[in-house]
Amino acid sequence: MNKTVVIKEFGGSDQLKIVDMPAGEPGDGQVRIAHKACGLNYIDVYQRTGLYPLSLPQALGMEAAGVIEAVGAGVTHVKVGDRVAYASMPPGSYCERRVMPAAQVCPLPDEISFEQGAAMMLQGMTVQYLFHRTTPLSKGDTVLFHAAAGGVGLIACQWAKSEGITLIGTAGSDEKCQLALDHGAMHCINYTTENFEEKVKELTGGAGVDVVMDSVGESTFEGSLNSLKPLGMMITFGNASGPVPPFNLAQLGAKGSLKITRPTLFTHIGKHEDCQEMARHLFSKVISGDVKIVIGQEFALDDVTAAHDALEARRTTGSTILTV
């Protein structure tokens, strides 16, 4: 049996079904991987609910780590028996084994566990492109990072500290703020008790920040724009509170010639060479100790419904994985 989590209709976590789906043999440019652990991310929720529409029925999951069982013709960068990890389209990582394109499958160093590998690829490479591929950031710059105690946020806190970048985080409780501070945030604002826009201005002496990195979406968008200094960059890379509504682009000029972008990881890792380079950079950060991967929750694959419920209810900190 090859347990695989699929959805046949969009909706709540009750739409997650475990079925037996044969993995098959890899074709040209493909590999078959026996998974040891799978990562859980908010994009999986977006896909399950239909916010990011998929053709149905569809297996879910965007990242995992495991061992290569078979390789197809033309695959040269990994071989049978290699430890690997990936974050990649198409979805389908919530399973015991799968056949998938090899281009975004990355050799996993022995120093990094399968659990860490499954927990870090999508979130870690997201941080890599946010700090190195979206807008130039230099030592001494200041970043406002929403959801700083989540999986992406805790990696970002550590990454920023390792590169001399001041990170101001936001989180929904004092406990989560302390977690962000413990991982390298210079400041963290509890948005349930303080107005983050006003607090950012206070912390920056009225200047604002160079860059905002926002995965929350609708509820933080306006305040994020108002937290930027003139010529600042707004990076909106998620919609946890709902999608950003349409707005008048003239606001960007009125607020100080601001810039805005809506990147996705899968554009950045679309080329094999870029993906492998980004993964090597991430692995080096982890092996050096600059970044520690915090796995806050582990669920068995059979408990995927409970895992989604915890993620949507914002009861999670750090990364969440499914063990196989």
State where each predicted segment sits.
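Glycine-rich phosphate-binding loop and adjacent beta-alpha segment
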Residues: E163, S219-D290, V324
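Adenosine-nucleotide cofactor-binding segment
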Residues: K161-T220, K271-E273
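Glycine-rich beta-strand-centered segment in the early N-terminal region that forms part
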Residues: P22-G39, T49-G92
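C-terminal hydrophobic helical "lid"/dimerization subdomain
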Residues: H272-V324
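NAD(P)H cofactor-binding loop motif with strongest signal on the N-terminal glycine-rich segment
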Residues: A147-A148, V216
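Hydrophobic/small residue at the entry helix of a nucleotide-binding pocket
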Residues: V152
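NAD(P)H dinucleotide-binding glycine-rich loop of Rossmann-like/cofactor-binding domains
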Residues: Y86-A147, W159
